[in-house]
Amino acid sequence: MQTGSTLHDDRTSVSALGGLGARARGASGRLLPEIWMQNGAKRVEQALARLLCAEDHGETELMAAMRYATLHGGKRTRALLCLAAGALADTPAHILDDVGAAIEMMHACTLVHDDLPAMDDDVLRRGLPTVHVKFGEATAILVGDALQAHAFLTLASLDAPGDNRIALVRELAQAVSAEGAAGGQAMDLSLVGKHVELDRIVAMHRMKCGALVRASVRMGALCAIAEDAADATLYCALDHYSACFGLALQVVDDILDATADTATLGKTPGKDAAAQKPTCASIMGLQAARQFALDLLCEAGEAIAPLGPRAERLAQMLQRASAYLFKHAPSA
């Protein structure tokens, strides 16, 4: 993979992202991005609290641990991507909220399992003790299993046509399959202590992180626009956008693991180096990895530019990611 010949400088990157957001804001007059994101995250959290209500399921230790894993922080990036893609059409908010909640349940499942001693062996997540530390390993395994099941139950119970529900279930299942997050985690574990090419790391990141990001975007669109009924360019643009966005998120995570403190990360820093895990940051160097992430965010913006103002929320998600990178991983 060549990166050096295509790098933009920071000024170009910010200009490209800012231009997209500025056009979208000027065209819509809708909620400011920060307010929309806060409201969207709150709606999804309310849906999670409702779907994992102790009164409905009983306040068992398992249910308490499931709520702990899902309701205590997080940027809700994947759910917001779902809501942003849902804004491409007039998708009912209550459907998007539940789909976003299902995605967050699945994301929490992957985090709970990734944190286990047999996997990444981490004791902090979102600034709190990980589920296996607080509730024990056996409960943590069951939490991941149950959250996965509840995610699919949520999608199967949506107030939506059967074909839509099937498409959503298939999309989420594919994202965490052996070709998605599970396969990516297996590849991650297999690369520990090895010298590998950048392409291998990129392929692993696209599976481990990128597959669920891609599903989040596609599921938001699928709520209202069936793929076979959409303009041929729509899902192609969304797939390109999400592939770049998902990889950029993981590259940023690689950088912050090497540079940020516990308060910023919400988890133990320096874990990748301590475990001898190859990452984009360790292979490329911090500054090249940072520029790589910015280039990916710009490429994602270019992918959705033809969609015009209706993609404003997706463009604003890119701006948020770029701002986070500039804040927590400034250039040398």
From Swiss-Prot:
Classification via SUPFAM superfamilies: Terpenoid synthases
EC number: 2.5.1.10
Keyword annotations from UniProtKB, A to Z: Cytoplasm, Isoprene biosynthesis, Magnesium, Metal-binding, Plasmid, Transferase
Gene Ontology terms describing biological process: isoprenoid biosynthetic process
EC class of the enzyme, as a word: transferase
GO molecular function: (2E,6E)-farnesyl diphosphate synthase activity; metal ion binding
Amino acids binding isopentenyl diphosphate: 75, 78, 107, 126
Cofactor annotation: Mg(2+)
Binding locations of (2E)-geranyl diphosphate: 125, 208, 250, 267
Residues that bind Mg(2+) 1: 114, 120
Reactions catalysed according to its record: isopentenyl diphosphate + (2E)-geranyl diphosphate = (2E,6E)-farnesyl diphosphate + diphosphate
Main subcellular localisation: cytoplasm
Cofactor note: Binds 2 Mg(2+) ions per subunit.
Compartment(s) of residence: Cytoplasm
Gene Ontology CC terms, in alphabetical order: cytoplasm
Residues given in the record as Mg(2+) 2 binding sites: 114, 120
PANTHER family associated with the record: FARNESYL DIPHOSPHATE SYNTHASE (PTHR43281:SF1)
Family assignment from sequence similarity: Belongs to the FPP/GGPP synthase family.
Name of the protein this chain belongs to: Probable farnesyl diphosphate synthase
